[in-house]
Amino acid sequence: FPYQGSSIMLESGKVNDYEVVYPQRLAPLPEGAVQQKYEDTMQYEFKVNGETIGLHMEKSKGLFSKDYSETHYSPDGRKITTYPSVEDHCYYHGRIENYEDSTASISACNGLKGHFKIQGETYFIESLKLSDSEAHAVFKYENVEKEDETHKMCGVTQNWKSYDPIKKPSWVNLTPKQQTWPQTSVNLQLVVDRSMYAKYNSDSEKITQTLQERVNIMKEIFKPLNLDITLSVIEMWDKKDLITVKTAATDTLKLFPKWRQTDLLKRIDNDNAQLQTAVDFDGETVGLAFKGTMCDKRYSAGIIQDHSAIPLLMAVTMAHELGHNLGMDHDDTYKCNCNVCIMPPRLNTNPSKTFSDCSNNDYQKFLTDKKPKCIHKKSLKTDTVSTSVSGNEPLDDNVDGFHA
């Protein structure tokens, strides 16, 4: 990039090498038509490295459940639940014109924020938030200063297996094999603990937007599996934690699913819940989840450490742990047909949104063997609580984690 200064501090962190761009919104509306703030489709143009980038975006459909709610607590411990209108939301998926394999996941809430990928390179874009200016920064992940250089990992263990490779899917088209898979959908609840609430300066609006950005990316990640991700609830433990969130990730993973079963599921139906915490788990672990437990009334859960300010990295971590719930093992570098994918035991320095052939086969096997009913929405009543896939409680070796 043309060097724009010594460094710049953005929401994503301190960036040393970036290019200032000025996205121009293209509005092909009929004369006299009123332009909405967040149209179903939007197009922007800007220049990167002297090349014109045409960003075509479509509003993310089905990002929120019809009964989407947000819950926080009063000083005396009462639950306060609201049902905000989310129809005119600001989250998009898209592509770069004239690049066949391009992808984009963008929030247009306050300027443009997100990432796009062209010719195998991932670029991030973020508003500079300058008064009377549409200036944005475009940069690569390698140019973001890392506060912690340790390798982040998943705490899950698994047994390596041999797989027959299948064609890697694109972001739009499913392979013939995947087209035979049933359309599935995961109703996801996110729970924010007190440490994460404090980390974001008790700004519930900021936390909510941050989590919605991440789920929007998750939605794109799982699309090639014919699996839809729908956000149903964000709950904030803004006054105090309702479990003891320990630095030992395995201990926290035992406590959170129990709370989900005894408290959460009695008032709000969901297929899966993830705890979001700023507690620094022991060692290199940044995520942990039970393996093959999607739809289990207790163990369909995972825990996520808020280890990065970059939405893509956090979305990949969340997708990784959800992948374990869906029966996916860690990728074996020597047996899986993917250089950089979602399910390695260690978080890649070059984040990927692609599942390997191993993960595809694991998911297919999970659907066939476990027959998880809760993610096949058309066959279930909307007011029923998900039932267990198996009558047996998961063993310790069915716990999988992520290290970064």
From Swiss-Prot:
Propeptide segments, given as residue ranges: 7-177, 379-404
Sorted UniProt keywords: Disulfide bond, Hydrolase, Metal-binding, Metalloprotease, Protease, Secreted, Signal, Zinc, Zymogen
GO cellular component: extracellular region; plasma membrane
Highest taxon in the source lineage: Eukaryota
Free-text tissue specificity from the UniProt record: Expressed by the venom gland.
Disulfide bridge map: 295-374, 336-358, 338-341
Required cofactor(s): Zn(2+)
GO biological process: proteolysis
SUPFAM superfamilies cross-referenced by the UniProt entry: Metalloproteases ('zincins'), catalytic domain
Keyword rRNA processing among UniProt keywords: no
Peptidase M12B domain ranges (all copies): 184-379
Entry keyword annotation includes Signal: yes
Region (Disordered) location: 385-404
Enzyme nomenclature, EC number: 3.4.24.-
Primary location: secreted
Residues binding Zn(2+): 320, 324, 330
Class of this enzyme: hydrolase
PANTHER family reported in the protein's UniProt record: ADAM A DISINTEGRIN AND METALLOPROTEASE DOMAIN, DISINTEGRIN AND METALLOPROTEINASE DOMAIN-CONTAINING PROTEIN 28
Subunit structure, interactors included: Monomer.
Family: Belongs to the venom metalloproteinase (M12B) family. P-I subfamily.
Entry function: This probable venom zinc protease is not hemorrhagic when 3 ug are injected onto the back skin of guinea pig.
Protein name per its UniProtKB record: Snake venom metalloproteinase H5
